[in-house]
Amino acid sequence: MQPTLLLSLLGAVGLAAVNSMPVDNRNHNEGMVTRCIIEVLSNALSKSSAPPITPECRQVLKTSRKDVKDKETTENENTKFEVRLLRDPADASEAHESSSRGEAGAPGEEDIQGPTKADTEKWAEGGGHSRERADEPQWSLYPSDSQVSEEVKTRHSEKSQREDEEEEEGENYQKGERGEDSSEEKHLEEPGETQNAFLNERKQASAIKKEELVARSETHAAGHSQEKTHSREKSSQESGEETGSQENHPQESKGQPRSQEESEEGEEDATSEVDKRRTRPRHHHGRSRPDRSSQGGSLPSEEKGHPQEESEESNVSMASLGEKRDHHSTHYRASEEEPEYGEEIKGYPGVQAPEDLEWERYRGRGSEEYRAPRPQSEESWDEEDKRNYPSLELDKMAHGYGEESEEERGLEPGKGRHHRGRGGEPRAYFMSDTREEKRFLGEGHHRVQENQMDKARRHPQGAWKELDRNYLNYGEEGAPGKWQQQGDLQDTKENREEARFQDKQYSSHHTAEKRKRLGELFNPYYDPLQWKSSHFERRDNMNDNFLEGEEENELTLNEKNFFPEYNYDWWEKKPFSEDVNWGYEKRNLARVPKLDLKRQYDRVAQLDQLLHYRKKSAEFPDFYDSEEPVSTHQEAENEKDRADQTVLTEDEKKELENLAAMDLELQKIAEKFSQRG
């Protein structure tokens, strides 16, 4: 027992040593290991007292084990290093960018020490430099520029998704306040503006941001309209004193105006790439357009010399819509492209809130179209009103919506209507004016649609259904007055067919009545809809020139054959469930494509019935001699059978049993044929 255990132990050690040999030294040590194993096994088998392992073999095993441990240690270190590189390139890139930012502008380094959450978000979104993790350890291995941009973009998108919900209400609240300042900033910014100026003004902007956050938290519980009007007046007073700091302020709070300017100008490649990636998802959160709408909406008011109160009213009213309305679609876009808005709306006559349509339109082309808002002139406003006023007059003339259309037309031709319809009272615009304007913008250019809608209003849904029912069922109703009810819907060709098919109506009515009578006679669950065959109606309507006399003869023949002496074809089928209209199928040869199969089926059924009848007549001769009418051929057969044999022998009984078994088999085969046919 002991040598066996020793041998197994030595074999395991030898195999482990061979398997754990390094790849590099395998050729060198393979012979040594093999020789050691052979020596150990031979010694164990020959001498039980011999030493199990020689010193040379022990040295070889130690060397191989040491190589294995070194290899495992090296692999673990490499794995840890790779994991660290995969996990921490963002931190390394942040450290790299922080150092480069410090070299670019020293004033920015003061603000890195203790950034608040709001400042962190502002700096990450507006400037494009990542400083959320500035206090984390910085690695000395820097990845490439493309990897830096990808990692920073990923971290920005993740952080924005977490903080969007927290800051959504506050940012929507501040969008209306900064509309005028953002428009000023868009015109004051120059392509040559450097990053140092941005870093110098960042500290002042962060202080103003803190003040506004405090004011917002104190006044947010009050009513929406009072709160926004008060904060708008306060921001308008401060804008004159702090024009330099407010110039870049919308960039820090929202990050989009600045980032889109930089993406076009190409100041810094990595920063612009990160900002473009950062701002694209925000197009679909319904939060980028309000800033642009405030910019675009305030441009005309400032350039044309409007009072500041008028632009304030429009911006405050738009901000009051907040999360519910699409500001950009109702302010800037509508004033620039009113005809397109009308043409797109006309396809949706019943929609009451156009924000979904505008959303779909800006999803495709908003990013290209609004990077640099275009200033509008007096001529563009006048042309807009000239285009829109015919549709408003059509509004009043066509349906007499007096109050709303009068209110629209009574406004100033240029500025007043725009600020009233687009910014002054947005709720009224969405609820009432938009519905009418949408309808008649489409109808002014396409009166055909209005005619169709008027037709639909003149004929309610019930009337249309009644007319269709009368038109489809005129063959069974048989009333000539139905044609006069359909005079408006049929053209001259149908009216000519009316005179040609007057007589055909009565004949089809006659045949339909016969079919109904026969169906009710044989099917207790008769449904008249089964007999409304589209094939028959088509033949009646399209005048297939079939002979009515021939059809009448066929009906009378089939009527006689419903109860023949023994119509074996009928009794084999399922008369009360599936094949109630078998006579119709026999007439319509197109419905029975396999005539040979039909004949075979009929022969099998007839043979089955004959065998069944012979068996019954032999068992009950007196019963079958009753008054039941039978054919002459069957009578002759019965008389012959009764004359030849009155009592069946054993052989005859066996034959009858065999015939009955064959009968069952034939019935099964016939059912299979019928199912396939």
Swiss-Prot record:
Description of post-translational modifications: Extensively processed by limited proteolysis at conserved basic residues. Alternative processing are seen in different tissues.
Modified residues (Phosphotyrosine): 401
Residue numbers spanned by region O-glycosylated at one site: 116-120
Originating species: Homo sapiens
Record's subunit section: Interacts with ITPR1 in the secretory granules.
Extent of Acidic residues compositional bias: 262-272
Known tissue expression: Detected in cerebrospinal fluid and urine (at protein level). Expressed in the adrenal medulla, and in pheochromocytoma. Not expressed in liver.
Pfam families documented for this protein: Granin (PF01271)
Keywords (A to Z) from UniProt: Cleavage on pair of basic residues, Disulfide bond, Glycoprotein, Phosphoprotein, Proteoglycan, Secreted, Signal, Sulfation
Chain positions found as Sulfotyrosine: 341, 474, 566, 624
Modified sites of kind Phosphoserine: 93, 99-100, 130, 149, 183, 225, 259, 263, 293-294, 311, 335, 367, 377, 380, 405, 533-534, 617, 626, 631
Residue stretches of biased makeup (Basic residues): 277-287
Signal peptide: 1-20
Family the UniProt entry places it in: Belongs to the chromogranin/secretogranin protein family.
Protein name listed in UniProt: Secretogranin-1
Annotated disulfide bonds: 36-57
PROSITE patterns given in the database record: GRANINS_1, GRANINS_2
Primary localisation category: secreted
UniProt region (Disordered), positions on chain: 64-463, 475-512, 622-653
Protein task: Secretogranin-1 is a neuroendocrine secretory granule protein, which may be the precursor for other biologically active peptides.
